[in-house]
Protein backbone atom coordinates (compact mmCIF):
# COMPACT_ATOMS: atom_id res chain seq x y z
CA UNK A 1 0.00 0.00 0.00
CA UNK A 2 2.84 2.36 -0.78
CA UNK A 3 2.05 5.93 -1.88
CA UNK A 4 -1.57 5.57 -0.87
CA UNK A 5 -3.61 7.51 1.59
CA UNK A 6 -6.78 6.82 3.53
CA UNK A 7 -9.13 9.77 3.98
CA UNK A 8 -11.59 9.44 6.86
CA UNK A 9 -14.51 11.81 7.30
CA UNK A 10 -16.53 11.71 10.53
CA UNK A 11 -19.99 13.20 10.93
CA UNK A 12 -22.03 13.49 14.15
CA UNK A 13 -24.51 15.69 15.98
CA UNK A 14 -22.59 15.49 19.29
CA UNK A 15 -19.10 17.03 19.23
CA UNK A 16 -17.92 14.96 22.21
CA UNK A 17 -18.64 11.68 20.40
CA UNK A 18 -16.89 12.83 17.24
CA UNK A 19 -13.80 13.99 19.15
CA UNK A 20 -13.65 10.70 21.07
CA UNK A 21 -13.95 8.71 17.82
CA UNK A 22 -11.27 10.81 16.14
CA UNK A 23 -8.91 10.23 19.06
CA UNK A 24 -9.49 6.45 18.86
CA UNK A 25 -8.76 6.42 15.12
CA UNK A 26 -5.57 8.49 15.52
CA UNK A 27 -4.36 6.28 18.39
CA UNK A 28 -5.03 3.09 16.42
CA UNK A 29 -3.30 4.36 13.30
CA UNK A 30 -0.22 5.60 15.19
CA UNK A 31 0.03 2.32 17.10
CA UNK A 32 0.26 0.39 13.81
CA UNK A 33 2.99 2.64 12.41
CA UNK A 34 1.09 4.98 10.08
CA UNK A 35 1.39 8.77 9.87
CA UNK A 36 -1.82 10.65 10.67
CA UNK A 37 -2.68 14.19 9.58
CA UNK A 38 -5.58 15.63 11.47
CA UNK A 39 -8.24 15.55 12.77
CA UNK A 40 -9.16 18.77 11.00
CA UNK A 41 -12.45 20.30 12.16
CA UNK A 42 -14.57 21.27 9.16
CA UNK A 43 -17.26 23.98 9.41
CA UNK A 44 -20.29 23.02 11.48
CA UNK A 45 -23.51 22.87 9.46
CA UNK A 46 -26.42 24.49 11.32
CA UNK A 47 -30.01 23.85 10.21
CA UNK A 48 -32.62 26.07 11.85
CA UNK A 49 -36.37 25.44 11.91
CA UNK A 50 -39.27 27.66 12.99
CA UNK A 51 -42.31 25.79 14.31
CA UNK A 52 -45.67 27.28 15.27
CA UNK A 53 -46.44 26.77 18.97
CA UNK A 54 -50.19 26.87 18.54
CA UNK A 55 -52.09 24.68 16.08
CA UNK A 56 -54.74 27.32 15.35
CA UNK A 57 -53.95 30.99 16.08
CA UNK A 58 -51.01 33.07 17.36
CA UNK A 59 -48.92 33.09 14.19
CA UNK A 60 -46.26 35.24 15.88
CA UNK A 61 -45.62 32.71 18.65
CA UNK A 62 -43.00 30.24 17.38
CA UNK A 63 -40.34 27.85 18.63
CA UNK A 64 -36.92 27.93 17.05
CA UNK A 65 -35.02 24.64 16.82
CA UNK A 66 -31.63 23.83 15.33
CA UNK A 67 -29.58 20.79 14.40
CA UNK A 68 -25.79 21.12 14.39
CA UNK A 69 -23.78 18.66 12.28
CA UNK A 70 -20.11 18.48 13.26
CA UNK A 71 -17.49 17.20 10.79
CA UNK A 72 -13.89 16.02 11.19
CA UNK A 73 -11.44 15.08 8.44
CA UNK A 74 -8.22 13.10 8.81
CA UNK A 75 -5.71 11.53 6.45
CA UNK A 76 -3.66 8.42 7.13
CA UNK A 77 -0.52 8.58 4.99
CA UNK A 78 1.32 5.37 3.94
CA UNK A 79 -0.98 2.91 5.76
CA UNK A 80 0.22 -0.63 6.35
CA UNK A 81 -1.87 -3.80 6.18
CA UNK A 82 -1.97 -3.81 9.99
CA UNK A 83 -3.40 -0.28 9.92
CA UNK A 84 -6.24 -1.26 7.60
CA UNK A 85 -7.06 -4.37 9.65
CA UNK A 86 -7.04 -2.39 12.91
CA UNK A 87 -9.32 0.29 11.44
CA UNK A 88 -11.79 -2.33 10.17
CA UNK A 89 -11.99 -3.92 13.65
CA UNK A 90 -12.36 -0.57 15.44
CA UNK A 91 -15.64 -0.24 17.33
CA UNK A 92 -16.90 3.36 17.22
CA UNK A 93 -19.90 4.64 19.21
CA UNK A 94 -23.36 4.82 17.67
CA UNK A 95 -24.22 8.25 16.31
CA UNK A 96 -20.96 8.76 14.43
CA UNK A 97 -21.04 8.46 10.65
CA UNK A 98 -17.78 7.26 9.10
CA UNK A 99 -16.86 7.70 5.44
CA UNK A 100 -13.59 6.11 4.31
CA UNK A 101 -11.94 6.70 0.93
CA UNK A 102 -8.77 5.06 -0.33
CA UNK A 103 -6.76 7.39 -2.56
UniProtKB/Swiss-Prot annotation:
Alphabetic keyword roster: Ribonucleoprotein, Ribosomal protein
GO CC term, one of those recorded: ribonucleoprotein complex
Pfam family, one: Ribosomal_S10
Recorded GO MF terms: structural constituent of ribosome; tRNA binding
Keyword Acyltransferase among record annotations: no
Subunit structure: Part of the 30S ribosomal subunit.
Entry similarity comment: Belongs to the universal ribosomal protein uS10 family.
Record's protein name: Small ribosomal subunit protein uS10
Lineage: Bacteria, Pseudomonadati, Pseudomonadota, Betaproteobacteria, Burkholderiales
Gene designation per UniProt: rpsJ
Amino acid sequence: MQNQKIRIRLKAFDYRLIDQSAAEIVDTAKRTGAVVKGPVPLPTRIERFDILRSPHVNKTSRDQLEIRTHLRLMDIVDPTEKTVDALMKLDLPAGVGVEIKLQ
